[in-house]
Design a protein with these regions (language model features):
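Gram-positive cell-envelope targeting signals
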Residues: 1, 362-363
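Extracytoplasmic/periplasmic membrane-proximal domains and adjacent transmembrane bundles
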Residues: 357-359
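Short, non-transmembrane alpha-helical segments in secretory-pathway proteins
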Residues: 193-230, 276-317
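Exposed beta-strand-loop-beta-strand "reactive/processing" segments of non-cytosolic proteins
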Residues: 145-191, 216-261, 266-267, 307-336
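Conserved histidines in hydrophobic membrane contexts and catalytic metal-binding motifs
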Residues: 208, 254, 326-334, 339-354, ...
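A short local loop/turn or secondary-structure capping micro-motif enriched for an aromatic residue
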Residues: 85-88, 96-97, 271-275, 347-349
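Short helix-loop boundary/capping segments
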Residues: 258-285
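Preferential activation on post-signal-peptide N-terminal prodomains/segments
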Residues: 1-200
Length: 363
């Protein structure tokens, strides 16, 4: 569906100015719950500037995270879960008939209700699900591949620290830290030092895409996943579901500051899918999960997002075989963790730290 939408939205041209038509929660939720719209949702806000053909303005930093596809090919609606705003755009050149057909004939359909959390509306699964467990053979690009792509092949120096990590440098401004080859770790950190202002939202998104392409992670379905302040993150998606690494790590995370750009990434490549063997994982209704977290001390109003993602699990039958286990992941206090991890945390320490931050901000 996402590929079909992307293909058609690239053809769309706005034939009039963007018009705000909704700015209240009540009206916004009427659109959310209207079955006549096909909704495509970004995991976090993006800006109008990324869709110049829809507004003819390269510096429009208004944000949205949700497309509403109506029954007409002449109108499209852009929604912002945070502000309850919906914008109407009259368009020409796009045909979403196939998209509507795909949505109508989808093989997997689960009843959900949309619940407002701290960062917007999350789909809450109403019934227990038996979600498929997938398996993949994985591999990793060599460190020399990333050194060559990110630093080049000449003028590069290296220095190994006592932890076995090696830092490759190109002049004083660009570095790549690679893991110890004997550690079994595959986490890299690329740093480019540059005095600059932290870019605005649009440029952070565009710059992060540039660095993702620079990495050259092969055969991946990397997608935009999250944006917090100066950070923009990406995850690999399999069967439309995000894959978390090392319990809760993101595959690529770009961080912008006034003196550098950092790109932390993992080199894992989910290369060969293993035929589905019928294994499933039982997932509770989402509200039951939230109730468990509340009983553990994590208030619902502190939950930013909740999704179903894949957790990695090594298969004992082969050193490169990974099982992808469907698991609830929850974002709270700006941290992503699985349900099991949050249930083991002393949530009061997070709450106290969060309150301290709020108090300091109010001084």
């Amino acid at each position: 569906m996402t590929l079909e939408f992307t293909k058609e939205i690239k053809k769309a041209k706005a034939t009039n100015k963007i018009k705000k038509i909704v700015d209240t929660r009540t009206k916004y939720e009427e659109y959310l719950n209207n079955p006549n719209y096909v909704q495509l949702v970004y995991p976090d806000e993006i800006t109008f500037s990324l869709f110049n053909q829809l507004n003819n303005a390269a510096n429009d930093n208004r944000e949205f995270n949700r497309f509403f596809i109506s029954q007409s090919n002449h109108w499209i609606y852009l929604g912002n879960d945070q502000t309850n705003e919906i914008y109407q755009v009259k368009i020409a050149g796009a045909n979403f008939d196939k998209l509507r057909k795909y949505a109508c004939n989808a093989k997997s359909k689960y009843p959900v209700r949309l619940v407002r959390l701290k960062e917007g509306y999350s789909p809450f699964y109403i019934k227990t699900m038996n979600a498929k467990v997938y398996s993949y053979l994985t591999n990793h690009q060599s460190y020399s591949y990333f050194v060559s792509r990110l630093l080049g092949t000449s003028g590069v120096t290296s220095k190994t620290n006592k932890n076995g990590q090696t830092v490759y440098s190109l002049n004083y401004y660009t570095r790549l830290r690679v893991p110890d080859s004997n550690s079994g770790e595959h986490n890299y950190l690329y740093t480019h030092y540059e005095k600059n202002k932290i870019p605005n939202t649009t440029n952070r998104l565009l710059d992060s895409v540039y660095y993702v392409h620079q990495l050259g992670l092969t055969e991946q379905d990397l997608r935009f996943f999250d944006a917090d302040g100066a950070n923009v993150s990406y995850l690999n998606y399999i069967e439309g579901i995000p894959v978390f690494l090392n319990k809760h790590d993101l595959q690529v995370k770009t961080t912008f500051s006034t003196d550098s750009i950092n790109v932390a990434f993992n080199s894992v490549n989910f290369q060969i899918p293993i035929p589905f063997d019928g294994q499933t994982k039982r997932l509770k209704p989402t509200q039951d999960v939230v109730d468990e977290l509340v009983n553990h001390g994590l208030k619902q109003e502190d939950i930013q997002r909740i999704i179903v993602g894949f957790a990695e699990e090594k298969d004992s039958s082969h050193h490169s075989l990974i099982n992808l286990i469907p698991t609830y992941y929850i974002k709270a206090y700006d941290e992503w963790k699985s349900l099991g991890e949050w249930e083991k945390q002393d949530v009061s320490t997070y709450r106290e730290a969060d309150q301290l931050t709020v108090n300091e901000g109010g001084k």
